A protein has these predicted regions:
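N-terminal assembly/attachment segments of tailed bacteriophage virion structural proteins
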Residues: 1-136
Length: 136
């Protein structure tokens, strides 16, 4: 059975990783965005250039290499408790040129704010399968 939730490199992201490897210049994963898919579940496609409906974007919190698989890069976003009031159904990672590198769908999750009576810090991770983690 195929995975219902997954992350993919966009067409641009695939080219950017290849260029980073060939030029030996690391790819700068700069920002991480979340969106609500305009109220609908989304399916990742390589030709995507933006989230369906972006709700929050911030600098990437961390980029790490998977210690068990050197072809996986883990990108993290921490959303503080004072940001929210929306559902999360999609995620995207952007480079320092504001171009979408990777896109993922996720199970629907509500991100509350403290003002609603239930604030929480939320950490999201996107795991990217790449040909070589040397590009990051």
């Amino acid at each position: 059975m195929a995975s219902q939730y997954f992350a993919i490199l966009t067409d641009y992201g695939t080219q950017a990783f290849a260029k980073a490897l060939s030029s030996k210049q690391p790819l700068q994963l700069a920002t991480f965005a979340v969106g609500d898919g305009n109220g609908q579940a989304v399916t990742p496609t390589e030709n995507r250039t933006a989230l369906v409906r972006e709700k929050h974007r911030a600098n990437v919190s961390a980029v790490t290499l998977d210690p068990r698989n050197n072809k996986q890069v883990i990108v993290e976003l921490t959303i503080p408790e004072d940001v929210g009031g929306f559902y999360i159904r999609e995620m995207g990672v952007f480079d320092n040129q504001n171009k979408l590198i990777a896109y993922a769908n996720s199970p629907e999750s509500y991100k509350p704010t403290e003002g609603s009576g239930s604030g929480k810090v939320q950490v999201l991770r996107m795991v990217l399968l790449v040909s070589s983690s040397n590009a990051v």
